[in-house]
């Protein structure tokens, strides 16, 4: 239990930061799912558009430090490779 005023404030901040981080991680997973779904539909133009939208989301989340920049690069690379592999 947080006893000092400083510890109570940090506990409050940790809760709000955790909620924000969880929301952003969920947004990241949703963006990736949209691209995967577009790739599954076999429409390259739709997949490309979904990829462009997801790249902005992935980069913004990496810039905020929610995920590491290498993880962001890995997601973008794998999605891009999957789109390029489409017939």
UniProtKB/Swiss-Prot annotation:
Lineage of origin: Bacteria, Pseudomonadati, Pseudomonadota, Betaproteobacteria, Nitrosomonadales
Family listed: Belongs to the bacterial ribosomal protein bS20 family.
Any Gene Ontology biological process: translation
Protein name: Small ribosomal subunit protein bS20
InterPro entries per the UniProt record, alphabetical: Ribosomal_bS20 (IPR002583), Ribosomal_bS20_sf (IPR036510)
UniProt KW keywords: Ribonucleoprotein, Ribosomal protein, RNA-binding, rRNA-binding
Role, per record: Binds directly to 16S ribosomal RNA.
GO MF assignments: small ribosomal subunit rRNA binding; structural constituent of ribosome
Provenance organism: Nitrosospira multiformis (strain ATCC 25196 / NCIMB 11849 / C 71)
